[in-house]
Amino acid sequence: MSGAERRPAAGRVQLDSKPTPTTTADGNQNITEVDAFDKRQTFDPAVQYKMNHQRRGVALIFNHEHFFWHLRLPDRRGTLADRNNLKRSLTDLGFEVRIFDDLKAEDVLKKVFEASRDDYSNADCFVCVFLSHGENDHVYAYDAQIKIETITNMFRGDKCQSLVGKPKIFIIQACRGDKHDDPVLVQDSVDSKDETTVNQTEVDAAGVYTLPAGADFIMCYSVAQGYFSHRETVNGSWYIQDLCEALGKHGSSLEFTELLTVVNRKVSHRKVDICRDINAIGKKQIPCFASMLTKKLYFHPKSK
């Protein structure tokens, strides 16, 4: 058979014809096999999302501080600091920020649906933030729970075609469990001011679980599943504080998942210093994110 006849046809899957056995010291055979591969499928690991559209995109912030009495949920003191910090950080990155405070569940879903019907053809991406209490696979609006999947489903490719292939970022600041993370490292405590401005630490009730959302989604959670998310009554939540600081310092230069890893590290170095629940003193927190992104994501400054 000639050399030309032995060559595989272009585009065909190529396999090693036979695994190669080797014999180990104890007499057993160690066989190495090669997985099939398609020569056409070559991926550039450095490929980035196209972020040079006319607009950066829309960022929705649903901020919930107060809740209907029958839910028996405490007010989320300090959440206004989170809302304002996020507005500043996202605006600096070029987003059109829309803020909604203490909306009922029906109104939240209406605003989300309206956003999903917008035309994002000339936008880079989309951001949606929830600052609230959470439970299982839900977050709380003013008067009722909302299933997170109900929200993310509105931005899938068959529902929001102008965001197909573009990053869809969801940030959830809510508790995800009923446990505190025990500290393993000692950290210097934060000095408190006079009693009227003491910055106490509180937790966001109940738990939120990670959900699949589809390609080009990234779900950013303030805490790993099963643990409390901490919020300071003056400065806001640990996660949003450190996220906004990282966005301010590195938002236009660092790849987004790398930036989130920096935030994980910063939050993990914190611990509870002042809290009405004495069992929470000294406890820690670790955020997490679930990335379904398919390319690297940068928020490089837009040319003017």
From Swiss-Prot:
<feature type="region of interest" description="Tri-arginine exosite">
    <location>
        <begin position="54"/>
        <end position="56"/>
    </location>
</feature>
<feature type="active site">
    <location>
        <position position="133"/>
    </location>
</feature>
<dbReference type="GO" id="GO:0030263">
    <property type="term" value="P:apoptotic chromosome condensation"/>
</dbReference>
<keyword id="KW-0963">Cytoplasm</keyword>
<keyword id="KW-0865">Zymogen</keyword>
<dbReference type="GO" id="GO:0006915">
    <property type="term" value="P:apoptotic process"/>
</dbReference>
<dbReference type="InterPro" id="IPR011600">
    <property type="entry name" value="Pept_C14_caspase"/>
</dbReference>
<dbReference type="GO" id="GO:0097284">
    <property type="term" value="P:hepatocyte apoptotic process"/>
</dbReference>
<dbReference type="GO" id="GO:0004197">
    <property type="term" value="F:cysteine-type endopeptidase activity"/>
</dbReference>
<dbReference type="InterPro" id="IPR015917">
    <property type="entry name" value="Pept_C14A"/>
</dbReference>
<comment type="similarity">
    <text>Belongs to the peptidase C14A family.</text>
</comment>
<dbReference type="GO" id="GO:0006309">
    <property type="term" value="P:apoptotic DNA fragmentation"/>
</dbReference>
<dbReference type="GO" id="GO:0002218">
    <property type="term" value="P:activation of innate immune response"/>
</dbReference>
<feature type="region of interest" description="Disordered">
    <location>
        <begin position="1"/>
        <end position="29"/>
    </location>
</feature>
<keyword id="KW-0539">Nucleus</keyword>
<keyword id="KW-0068">Autocatalytic cleavage</keyword>
<dbReference type="GO" id="GO:0030262">
    <property type="term" value="P:apoptotic nuclear changes"/>
</dbReference>
<dbReference type="InterPro" id="IPR002398">
    <property type="entry name" value="Pept_C14"/>
</dbReference>
<dbReference type="GO" id="GO:0016540">
    <property type="term" value="P:protein autoprocessing"/>
</dbReference>
<dbReference type="GO" id="GO:0006508">
    <property type="term" value="P:proteolysis"/>
</dbReference>
<feature type="active site">
    <location>
        <position position="175"/>
    </location>
</feature>
<feature type="propeptide">
    <location>
        <begin position="192"/>
        <end position="204"/>
    </location>
</feature>
<dbReference type="GO" id="GO:0060545">
    <property type="term" value="P:positive regulation of necroptotic process"/>
</dbReference>
<dbReference type="GO" id="GO:0005634">
    <property type="term" value="C:nucleus"/>
</dbReference>
<dbReference type="GO" id="GO:0005737">
    <property type="term" value="C:cytoplasm"/>
</dbReference>
<feature type="region of interest" description="130's region">
    <location>
        <begin position="137"/>
        <end position="154"/>
    </location>
</feature>
<protein>
    <recommendedName>
        <fullName>Caspase-6</fullName>
        <ecNumber>3.4.22.59</ecNumber>
    </recommendedName>
</protein>
<keyword id="KW-0053">Apoptosis</keyword>
<dbReference type="InterPro" id="IPR029030">
    <property type="entry name" value="Caspase-like_dom_sf"/>
</dbReference>
<dbReference type="InterPro" id="IPR002138">
    <property type="entry name" value="Pept_C14_p10"/>
</dbReference>
<comment type="subunit">
    <text>Heterotetramer that consists of two anti-parallel arranged heterodimers, each one formed by a 18 kDa (p18) and a 11 kDa (p11) subunit.</text>
</comment>
<dbReference type="GO" id="GO:0070269">
    <property type="term" value="P:pyroptotic inflammatory response"/>
</dbReference>
<dbReference type="InterPro" id="IPR001309">
    <property type="entry name" value="Pept_C14_p20"/>
</dbReference>
<dbReference type="GO" id="GO:0008234">
    <property type="term" value="F:cysteine-type peptidase activity"/>
</dbReference>
<keyword id="KW-0788">Thiol protease</keyword>
<dbReference type="InterPro" id="IPR033139">
    <property type="entry name" value="Caspase_cys_AS"/>
</dbReference>
<dbReference type="GO" id="GO:0043525">
    <property type="term" value="P:positive regulation of neuron apoptotic process"/>
</dbReference>
<comment type="function">
    <text>Cysteine protease that plays essential roles in programmed cell death, development and innate immunity. Acts as a non-canonical executioner caspase during apoptosis: localizes in the nucleus and cleaves the nuclear structural protein lamin-A/LMNA thereby inducing nuclear shrinkage and fragmentation. Lamin-A/LMNA cleavage is required for chromatin condensation and nuclear disassembly during apoptotic execution.</text>
</comment>
<keyword id="KW-0645">Protease</keyword>
<keyword id="KW-0378">Hydrolase</keyword>
<dbReference type="GO" id="GO:0070306">
    <property type="term" value="P:lens fiber cell differentiation"/>
</dbReference>
<dbReference type="GO" id="GO:0072332">
    <property type="term" value="P:intrinsic apoptotic signaling pathway by p53 class mediator"/>
</dbReference>
